[in-house]
Amino acid sequence: MANKMTMKIARLNITLILTLVGVGVWAQGPNNSGTYYQNANGKKGEALKTAMYNIIKNPDVVSYSGLIDAYQKTDTRPDGYVRDWYSNVTNFRHNTDKAGNYKKEGDVYNREHSIPQSWFSKASPMKSDIVHVVPTDGYVNNRRSDYPFGEVGKVEYQSTGGYSKLGPCRTSGYSGKVFEPNDEIKGDMARIYFYMATCYEDKIAGWSGEIITGTKYQPYSTWQFDMLMRWSEQDPVDSVEIARNNAVYEVQGNRNPFVDYPGLENYVWGTKKVNAFSYNNYDVDTNGIDDMQQEMTPAPDIITTLYGVRVNSHHLSPGIYIRNGKKYLVR
C-alpha cells in the first residue's frame, strides 16, 4: 500500500511539474513576442508602465548614419520604395535618394525625429532610436521643424494633397503652431509617443519642449495627451505597424508594447488602469474598428489590405482590412 501511495504521489508530482512546464512553454504574447512581456504580468497603471520600462529600456540602437540602411527593414513599401511618413506622392529609393540638398517635396528623404531631438539635446540613445526616428520627405520634414504635433486650424503650409499640414493649433489648451500628420498615421505617432514616455521613463522628465511637463508618469501636456489618446483610438494598430514593430525588434532588440497590445495606453493611464495586465491573455481593444465577416460571397465592395493590395473576399484571414475607405476587423 505504501509503495502504491508513493507511486501515486510521484505521478501527481510529475503531472504537476509537466503542467507548470507546459504553462511556461505555451504561454505566449502576441506577434511572436513569446514571453518578452512576462515580467509585466499582473501590473496596473503606473506600476505597469514601469514594468514595461524595465522590459524595453536600453535599446541596442544603430548609429545615426546606420538608420538609412535599417530603414530597408523597417520602412519599405511593397513596391520596394521608402515608406514616407509625411508625403504620399514620393517614390524614394533606399540609399540612392537619401538626405541631401532639397528645394521641394519629392527631392530626398531624411531621418525625422517624431519627438524633436532638440527636446532631448540630441542625446543618445534617443537620437537614433528607430522606433521614433522615421523616414520622411526632407522638404516636408524641414517645414515641420520642431513644432509639436497637433490639429491645424488655419493651414499655413500643406504637403501635396494636404497629406501633412502646418499652422496654428485648433485644439483647446494650445494656440501655438503645430504640425498635423495624416489621419492614417496619427495613431502610429501616438503609440510612438507612448513608447517614448515609457522607454525613457528615467529621462523624459528632464527634457524640454512645449508639451513636456517635467513629470515621469504622464509627461505630456494635458491637451497633447488627450489628443494622442484620441488619435490612437481613431487610428488603431494595423498590419503595417505590426510588421514595422517586428522589424524594429530585429534591428535594436526591443519592441513597442503599445503596438503589440492595442489600447495598452488605457491600462497605463486611462479607464482600465485599475485592471491587471495579462501578457498572454490580453483583452484586445478594437475600439474604432467595425467587425467584418470572413466569408463575403458575392463581394459587395472592393476590399484591400492596408497596403492597398486587393484581396479575395471569399475567405479573409484574421486581420484588419480597408473597405470603402474604412478599416474593418476580421477576427
Where are these regions (language model features)?
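Short, His- and charge-rich active-site/binding loops that engage polyanionic ligands
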Residues: 88-108
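N-terminal module-boundary/linker segments of secreted carbohydrate-active enzymes
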Residues: 26-92, 267-275
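Domain-level detector of nuclease and nuclease-like folds
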Residues: 101-110, 114-285
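C-terminal tail/sorting-segment detector
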Residues: 9-10, 320-331
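Bacterial N-terminal signal peptides that target proteins for export
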Residues: 2-14
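C-terminal trimerization/auto-chaperone modules of long, extracellular attachment fibers and adhesins
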Residues: 311-313
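N-terminal signal peptide c-region/cleavage motif recognized by signal peptidases
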Residues: 22-24
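Residue-level detector of functionally pivotal "anchor" positions at catalytic/ligand-binding pockets or at interdomain
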Residues: 277-309
